[in-house]
Every structure is written in structure tokens, then in C-alpha cells.
């Protein structure tokens, strides 16, 4: 009996050695990076080269506000140099200023941009704490509703922050808010918000293996909770890399991040992956 068991175990070990690991199905279709930034004037060249290597059709460049006074020039130059690959949002002035909406209206008329942002509502690292249901931001949402132009916000959700966000969403149902980085929240919290607010979209930007919380480690599987929610509500999510610091624009790192993105998308049902990868962004931002 012992000899039989030993032989069986040896056979299993041999089979494990010669049987290849299950192949990972990478998503191979088009991609739109729905949330990008520039750290300097030249990073766009490295990024576009990586886009071409990885079949990324478009990147939506967003502003980060007063911390980069020159970014408007960098973004304008990128648009002119790569008009087929780069789209851009309108930078939002101080969202607590009652004049901000009027300034945005002028810029939207001038640029024909299809998104406003990124607006920092709650960012603990920079000690930013703003109320999205406050009067100045309400004017911005009114403009969003009138022009049909979504606004991207950075809002690190707590129960109180989520309540304020929901009040803003309820005030202008025709305005679309895109919650960047999934609000650094949980699938359970977002599922409730999404179910109650049809005018809320989620971009999954910056949730790669270089940051926390991440959708997946560099070689690990897609988190089960995120996979379940994305599959359940595939029309509410978009991918984005949210690259900003210069070290992330190094070619080798870009290759790793873009490969990771395709691997994670490959874990979703093909029709869901296609929506998250590019269809939702193309529809929301009117991208070709």
C-alpha cells in the first residue's frame, strides 16, 4: 500500500512539473487612459511612445491645479503635437470661489473641452477639505448640467464626505460627477452610491500596483470585490493610469503599468472589459 501511494505521489509531482501554468488572458482591444497628468513639458513624448507600443488610443489630460502653474502650457503643447492621441479637460479654478463657474463657462466655450477637472474636494495629503454641496461648487455643477460636460473630482470618501457628495449629486441630476480613484473607497460603499445616483461615474485611475488601495498587485489577481462590482455595473467605470510624478514616465515603468492594466482587464468578461477599457470613456467624453 505504501509503495502504491508513493508511486501516485511521484506521478502527481511529475505532472505538476511538466504541466504549464494556466495562461493569463490579457485584454488585447483598444484602451483609453481616462485620467492622465503631465509632470513637465517633455513627459508626453515618452508617454505617447508607450501608448503606441500598447495600443492606447487616447489619453485624457487633466489639470492638478495651482501646484503646477505651467501645466496649462504643457497640456496645450501636447494637444497641438499629438492631436489624434491627446484630449484635455478644462482646469478648474478655486472651486470655493463663486466666480469659478463663470470662468469655466468662458473656457469651455473657447476650448470645446468635454470634461472639467480634476477638482480636489478632499485630499488629506494636501490638507484639502471642501464641501461639494457648497454654493460655489453648486454653480459648477449647474454649468455641468447646462453644457453636458462632466466634472472629475478627487474626493477621498469618509461617511461624511460620501454624504456631502450624495447631496451634490442629488442637487443636479443632469450633471455628471466622475469620482477619480474610486474615491479611495470600498466596493460596498460605491455600490450603494452608484445604485442611488445615476449621475455618478467612477474612474479607476491610480489604483495600480504602485499605490494603495490597488485593484491588484503587479502579478496578483484582480480583487474579488472590485471584480464583482465592475461586472455588475459595467457602464459606470473607466480605466486610467493617473500618472503624474516623473519616475512613472520612465519607459520600463510605463510598460509595466500598461501591461498590468491589460492583465487586469483580461480577468473581466470580454464585453465588460471593452466597456471599462474604452467604450465608457469614449461615450462620456465624446472621444473618437
Residue ranges and their predicted role:
Residues 24, 66, 72-151, 206-209, ...:
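Active-site gating/metal-coordination segments in enzymes
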Residues 36-44, 63-71, 93-100, 124-131, ...:
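Acidic-and-aromatic substrate-binding clefts and catalytic sites of carbohydrate-active enzymes
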Residues 35, 51, 59, 88, ...:
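Divalent metal-coordination and catalytic microenvironments
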Residues 10-11, 21, 221:
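Cleavable N-terminal signal peptides
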Residues 83-86, 90, 130-239:
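Catalytic pocket-lining loop regions of alpha/beta-barrel enzymes
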Residues 7-17:
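Bacterial N-terminal signal peptides
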Residues 2, 22-30, 35, 45-49, ...:
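Mid-to-C-terminal alpha-helical segments outside catalytic/metal-binding sites
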Residues 46-50, 71-78, 103-107, 136-140, ...:
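A general structural detector for well-ordered alpha-helical segments in enzyme core domains, enriched
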Amino acid at each position: 500500500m505504501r509503495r502504491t501511494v508513493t508511486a501516485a505521489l511521484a506521478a502527481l509531482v511529475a505532472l505538476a512539473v511538466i504541466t504549464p501554468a494556466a495562461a493569463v488572458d490579457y485584454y488585447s482591444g483598444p484602451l483609453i487612459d481616462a485620467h492622465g497628468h503631465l509632470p513637465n513639458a517633455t513627459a508626453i513624448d515618452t508617454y505617447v511612445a508607450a501608448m503606441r507600443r500598447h495600443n492606447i488610443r487616447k489619453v485624457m489630460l487633466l489639470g492638478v491645479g495651482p501646484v503646477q502653474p505651467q501645466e496649462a502650457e504643457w497640456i496645450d503643447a501636447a494637444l497641438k503635437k499629438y492631436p489624434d492621441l491627446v484630449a484635455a479637460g478644462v482646469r478648474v479654478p478655486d472651486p470655493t470661489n463663486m466666480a469659478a463657474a463663470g470662468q469655466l463657462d468662458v473656457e469651455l466655450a473657447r476650448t470645446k473641452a468635454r470634461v472639467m477637472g480634476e477638482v480636489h474636494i478632499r485630499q488629506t495629503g494636501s490638507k484639502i477639505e471642501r464641501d461639494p454641496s457648497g454654493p460655489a461648487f453648486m454653480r459648477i455643477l449647474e454649468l455641468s448640467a447646462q453644457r453636458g460636460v462632466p466634472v472629475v473630482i478627487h474626493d477621498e470618501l469618509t461617511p461624511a464626505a460620501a454624504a456631502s457628495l450624495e447631496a451634490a449629486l442629488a442637487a443636479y441630476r443632469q450633471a455628471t460627477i466622475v469620482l477619480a480613484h474610486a474615491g479611495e473607497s470600498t466596493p460596498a460603499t460605491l455600490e450603494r452610491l452608484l445604485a442611488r445616483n445615476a449621475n455618478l461615474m467612477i474612474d479607476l485611475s491610480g489604483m495600480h500596483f504602485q499605490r494603495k488601495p490597488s485593484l491588484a498587485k503587479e502579478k496578483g489577481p484582480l480583487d474579488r470585490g472590485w471584480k464583482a462590482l465592475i461586472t455588475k455595473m459595467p457602464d459606470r467605470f473607466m480605466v486610467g493610469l493617473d500618472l503624474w510624478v516623473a519616475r512613472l514616465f520612465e519607459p520600463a515603468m510605463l510598460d509595466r503599468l500598461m501591461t498590468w492594466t491589460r492583465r487586469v482587464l483580461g480577468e473581466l468578461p470580454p464585453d465588460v472589459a471593452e466597456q471599462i477599457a474604452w467604450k465608457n470613456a469614449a461615450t462620456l467624453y465624446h472621444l473618437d
